[in-house]
Amino acid sequence: MKFDRHRRLRSSATMRDMVRENHVRKEDLIYPIFVVEKDDVKKEIKSLPGVYQISLNLLESELKEAYDLGIRAIMFFGVPNSKDDIGTGAYIHDGVIQQATRIAKKMYDDLLIVADTCLCEYTDHGHCGVIDDHTHDVDNDKSLPLLVKTAISQVEAGADIIAPSNMMDGFVAEIRRGLDEAGYYNIPIMSYGVKYASSFFGPFRDAADSAPSFGDRKTYQMDPANRLEALRELESDLKEGCDMMIVKPALSYLDIVRDVKNHTNVPVVAYNVSGEYSMTKAAAQNGWIDEERVVMEQMVSMKRAGADMIITYFAKDICRYLDK
C-alpha cells in the first residue's frame, strides 16, 4: 500500500523547529499597562491575576521590567481621579495617559507607545462618546471631535501610534484628518475597526473602571454572530486611512483574523483580551492546564490565523518563556 509519510518531518525536535511555519517573537508583542493617577498604588486586579493598576509615581519600575525583558511596545490605559460626561480627562495636557507617555519616552526613546484613543475610561457614564439627551445613545458625530482632540493630545505627549477603540463611524477619517492638519503626517493609526460587543471584555472593565453605567455597547460594537460585517468595517477603515487593523477579541474570532488578513496588506493585530487571559490563568492556578504550553499555543494560533502583532497581558510571561 502506498501512502504519504508526513511523520518524516516530525522525527525530532530539531526537525520540527526547522520546518515550523509560525513563530512568536518578542517583537510581536504589545503590553497593556493600567495607570492610575493616585500615588503609591500597585493593586492587583482581582479578575486579572498578575495584572496591576500602577500609579504614575511607580510606573518607572514596571516599564524597566518590561523593557529589560525585551518588550518594545506598550499600550497605556488610564484610570483618572475624576470623570465627567464628555471625557475631558482623555484630552487634557496633564491627563494620566499623557503623563505616563512622557515618563516612558523620557526613559526609553525606542519604546513604542500605542495610545488607546477612547473616552470610556474618562466619562462618568462609561460609554465611548457623548450621550444624546433624547435617545440616551452615543451621539456618533458629536463624539468625533473629542476623539480627534484626544489623539492630538496623545501624540503631543509622545505617543508613536494612535489606536482608536471607540467604534464610531468615521473615526479613522476624522482622526487622520486631525492629525494631518496638526502636522502629524507620519503618525500611524492602528484601528480597532473590527471590535465585537464581546462578553470577554469583563475583567478589563474592572481594571479600567470603564463599565457602562447604563445599557451596553451593542449599538456601536459589532454583533459576535457576524462575519461579513467585519469586512465592511475593514474596507471603510482602509479607505479612511488606517495603517494597521486590530481584531478584538482574538481567540474566539480567529476566523475573523484570517478573513482580515486575506483582505488587506496592512499589518493585522490580534487583541488577546482580558477574559481570554483570565480563563487561562484560572485554569492554570487550579492545576488543570500547563500555563506556559497553553499560552504559547494560543499565541501561535493567533500568528497562524494571520496576526502580525498580538496585544496581550501575557507579554512579560511570554518573554520569560522565550528566554529559556
Curated annotation (Swiss-Prot):
GO MF, any single term: porphobilinogen synthase activity
Gene Ontology cellular-component terms listed: cytosol
Reported cofactor(s): Zn(2+)
NCBIfam families found in the cross-reference section: PRK09283.1 (NF006762)
Similarity-based family: Belongs to the ALAD family.
Subunit composition and interactions: Homooctamer.
Protein's name in the database: Delta-aminolevulinic acid dehydratase
